[in-house]
């Protein structure tokens, strides 16, 4: 009986653990999904952005008390404008997805939503971390030795 309880606990804890991408694995995933040069944004820019937003963590969440919104997932996409979490007042849901979709290990939906964000007039500047850590910097190290 104890063995079953331990096994059940291990399975439950494994199911809620985040996938944390390795830098090159993330770069290759982005490239396979058409992010290299998408709307003029380099692969290195995307990798830099994700490192500073979530440290490549698919389960990253950050609550913003000022507007009661939350940033979700590897790209830290905000519930005020881009997804629906059922909690954010006056949310727009421009990506047309539940915010929980941005927390999946399979980041296909997160990538599609990030593409939607970057098509907005603000473009990549919508991400504060990109402006603070990536803009006008040599980002070659973010994709070095990744084979992309």
UniProtKB/Swiss-Prot annotation:
Q: Which GO terms describe its molecular function?
A: hydrolase activity, acting on glycosyl bonds; identical protein binding; lysozyme activity
Tissue expression, as annotated, is: Expressed in lung, small intestine and spleen.
Q: Pfam families, from UniProt?
A: Lys
Which N-terminal residues, if any, form the signal peptide? Answer: 1-18
Q: Where in the cell is it found?
A: Secreted
Q: Does the keyword Transport apply?
A: no
Ranges for the C-type lysozyme domain? 19-148
- Which terms under GO biological process does the entry name? defense response to bacterium; defense response to Gram-negative bacterium; defense response to Gram-positive bacterium; killing of cells of another organism
**Family that this chain belongs to:** Belongs to the glycosyl hydrolase 22 family.
Described purpose of this protein according to its UniProt entry: Lysozymes have primarily a bacteriolytic function; those in tissues and body fluids are associated with the monocyte-macrophage system and enhance the activity of immunoagents. In the intestine they may also have a digestive function.
Know the name of this protein?
Lysozyme C-1
State the organism named in the record: Rattus norvegicus (Rat)
